[in-house]
Regions:
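Short, hinge-like loop/turn segments at secondary-structure boundaries
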Residues: 12-17, 33-34, 57, 113-115, ...
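A generic, well-ordered mixed alpha/beta core segment in the N-terminal half of proteins
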Residues: 33-71
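Short hydrophobic/aromatic-rich motifs at helix boundaries and adjacent loops
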Residues: 17-22, 54, 95-98
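Short beta-strand/loop segments at the ligand-binding rim of alpha/beta enzyme cores
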Residues: 10-16, 58-60, 132-139
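Acidic (Asp/Glu)-rich catalytic clusters
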Residues: 7-12, 28-32, 48-58, 83-94
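Acidic/polar active-site rim loop that often engages polyanionic ligands
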Residues: 26-33, 59-66, 98-107
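N-terminal active-site wall of soluble small-molecule enzyme domains
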Residues: 1-35, 39-46
């Protein structure tokens, strides 16, 4: 919905849809409005292939890998196999590979063990892709917390969430930034 509104407002830059789109109508809207859906498996990739091939134009997508968040994404161990399969699809273009950090806002200096493990798993997939000569497109791992505290996790893109809305991802992060909340949540 938000991606369509951005297009209707005249935004021409690439727009990545971070949610899990599995219904053909959702993916058809992505194709029509030139939005990049997030894929978490071959089912969605094949739907994109069929829709895009029928329209005569390619569809750019990002593949999300689950490295520990356990919310959305293909198991990271399947990353290289999925990229190989997606690369073989004529009407689907892999524009990026990403994952989401589960605990990047943990207190303490440096990376917490889970974030370090997630980075290692993500790196293992990227290394495998490079060695096999497969495309990764834009690589992205950093959420707001990792953007603020871990430059080594920035790769090609960062995905700020809470910080975009003027909120620090944790009380101990971003204290030197002049973030101004863009929203409030109230309840009675």
């Amino acid at each position: 919905q938000e991606g369509v509104e951005l297009r209707q407002a005249g935004l021409a830059q690439p727009v990545l849809v971070l949610g899990n789109l599995t219904h053909p109508d959702e993916l058809r809207a992505c194709l029509h409005w030139q939005l990049m859906p997030t894929l978490s498996g071959m089912r969605e990739a094949l739907l994109c292939q069929n829709l895009a091939a029928g329209s005569g134009r390619a569809m750019a997508v990002h593949l999300k890998l689950d490295t520990g968040m356990s919310r959305l994404g293909a198991p990271w161990q399947e990353g290289q196999r999925l990229v190989e399969a997606i690369a073989a699809l004529e009407a689907v273009q892999l524009a990026g590979v990403y994952s989401h950090l589960a605990d990047a806002d943990a207190p303490g200096a440096g990376l917490d063990p889970l974030t370090r493990q997630q980075q290692q798993q993500f790196e293992a997939v990227l290394t495998g892709l490079q060695q096999a000569g497969l495309p990764s497109g834009a690589r992205h791992l950093a959420n707001s917390a990792a953007t603020l505290r871990s430059p080594g996790l920035h790769y090609d893109l960062v995905r700020v969430g809470l910080a975009l809305y003027g909120h620090r991802p944790a009380a101990h992060l971003g204290g030197g930034l002049a973030l101004q909340p863009a929203m409030q949540v109230r309840a009675r």
